[in-house]
């Protein structure tokens, strides 16, 4: 697979833009002390499932996981650090929001049939994981070359293990190595 500068630029743009969306949402919710209770209690199609997350004993955990999860997913995508680890959580969150916004067969505003931006974001994150986006002008490539990571298969798998060598992303000098 041959990558051009344009291809890498698109991967970085998608990663940073989707990451910013998560980062901003998480930051706003933390600063505003947002609670998901009203949102969860007004879900239509899967109300029984989502109502459990709004129960008084569970809601503080739901709020914490949503706020801080969005913030951490956003930081990961914007920086390109641990994209393979945070990506599936971003997909899970977007698919969960997708089903929470359904009023079968429509999505929330009745202008969309089946598809809304949550589903699009989930697919973009799948694309980013598949293309080792953390290695493309992100920190995954640099961290993967650190000796402690390079010699530990588990740690290496958290970054961009098995990524094509055409994603060198950040020069080795960034992590202190000289050639």
Kindly label every feature range from the protein language model:
Residues 1-42, 49-72, 79-179:
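Extended, low-polarity transmembrane helix blocks
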């Amino acid at each position: 697979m041959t990558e051009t500068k344009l291809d890498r630029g698109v991967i970085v743009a998608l990663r940073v833009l989707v990451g910013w969306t998560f980062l901003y949402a998480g930051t706003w919710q933390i600063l505003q002390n947002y609670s998901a209770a009203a949102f969860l209690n007004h879900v239509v199609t899967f109300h029984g499932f989502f109502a459990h997350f709004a129960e008084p004993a569970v809601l503080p955990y739901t709020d914490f996981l949503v706020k801080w999860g969005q913030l951490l997913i956003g930081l990961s995508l914007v920086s390109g650090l641990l994209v393979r680890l945070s990506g599936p959580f971003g997909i899970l969150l977007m698919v969960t929001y997708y089903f929470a916004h359904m009023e079968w067969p429509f999505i929330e505003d009745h202008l969309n049939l089946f598809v809304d931006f949550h589903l699009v974001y989930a697919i973009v994150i799948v694309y980013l994981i598949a293309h080792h986006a953390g290695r493309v002008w992100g920190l995954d490539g640099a961290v993967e070359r650190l000796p402690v990571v390079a010699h530990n298969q588990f740690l290496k798998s958290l970054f961009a293990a098995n990524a094509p060598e055409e994603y060198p992303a950040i020069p080795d000098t960034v992590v202190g190595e000289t050639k």
